């Protein structure tokens, strides 16, 4: 939805001249966003709007174990199915104001009604709540990057709201470059985090241990990549690489 639709209606850039000169959108490009990963497990997340975009946002929240409530008089058939199976709670009605946000951690407005979107944003802002109005950067205090996700590996791509289409293109390109070998390496390294904390007494020693493996020769990513489909030969080679690093660092600690 274009930013012009919000002119004179509490637009965050405070332009009430009958038109919006896009200053509010430009301001998003200059905003130094703080990038973080949110743990949504057990947290109430609200989506207002039950169309295709609402479905996309609901599925993203469900993928992160959010407790999702949908408010919409009508909903996409897939959302209806989610409600019937108990995956989400669907309140089949219009947005009712600030009371709908009670106990909510995050709200996403995905309607085609300008007034509803403005109301959701204003109500959430007054409660210092995370709020995103889809495709209207001025009415967001957080934005949703495109995500490349493989196993425990997640890569976020953001254009600060300037071009979601560009972010999606970058996502496709990154998916081809960083895939299963990187995700598998993350799992293998996680397996020895406990050993590292129990054996290597300082942060610097643990840092050198892990960085030595990740940036070492032979390259563990290339070992995993070359061993894909070869009865786990790549993974076995990386396990041996890690074991060698463990022995070397444990020896250094014993001599200290």
Where are each of the predicted segments found?
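Hydrophobic beta-strand scaffold residues
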Residues: 68, 90, 130-131
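Residue-level detector of alpha-helix initiation sites
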Residues: 52-53, 114-115, 161
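An accessory alpha-helical subdomain
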Residues: 161-256
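Conserved SAM/SAH-binding loop
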Residues: 93-97
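ADP-ribose/adenylate-binding Rossmann-like module
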Residues: 106-112, 117-144
């Amino acid at each position: 939805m274009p930013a012009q639709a919000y002119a004179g209606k509490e637009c965050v850039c405070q332009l009430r001249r009958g038109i919006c000169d896009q200053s509010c959108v430009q301001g998003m490009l200059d905003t130094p966003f703080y990038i973080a990963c949110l743990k949504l497990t057990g947290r109430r997340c609200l989506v207002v709007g039950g169309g295709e975009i609402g479905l996309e946002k609901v599925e993203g929240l469900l993928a992160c174990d959010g407790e999702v409530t949908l408010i919409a008089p009508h909903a996409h058939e897939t959302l209806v199915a989610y409600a019937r199976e108990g995956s989400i709670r669907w309140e089949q009605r219009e947005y009712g104001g600030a009371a709908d946000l009670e106990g909510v951690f995050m709200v996403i407005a995905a309607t085609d009604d300008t007034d509803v979107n403005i109301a959701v944003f204003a109500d959430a802002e007054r409660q210092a709540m995370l709020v995103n109005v889809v495709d209207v950067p001025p009415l967001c205090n957080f934005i949703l990057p495109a995500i490349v996700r493989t196993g425990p590996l997640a890569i976020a791509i953001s254009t600060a709201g300037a071009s979601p289409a560009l972010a999606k293109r970058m996502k496709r390109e990154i998916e081809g470059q960083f895939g299963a070998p990187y995700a598998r390496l993350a799992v293998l390294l996680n397996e020895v985090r406990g050993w590292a904390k129990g054996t290597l007494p300082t942060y610097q020693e643990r840092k050198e241990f892990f960085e030595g493996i990740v940036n070492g020769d032979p390259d563990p990513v290339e070992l995993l990549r070359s061993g894909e489909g070869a009865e786990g030969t790549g993974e076995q080679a990386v396990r041996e690489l890690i074991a060698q690093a463990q022995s070397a660092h444990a020896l250094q600690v014993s001599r200290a």
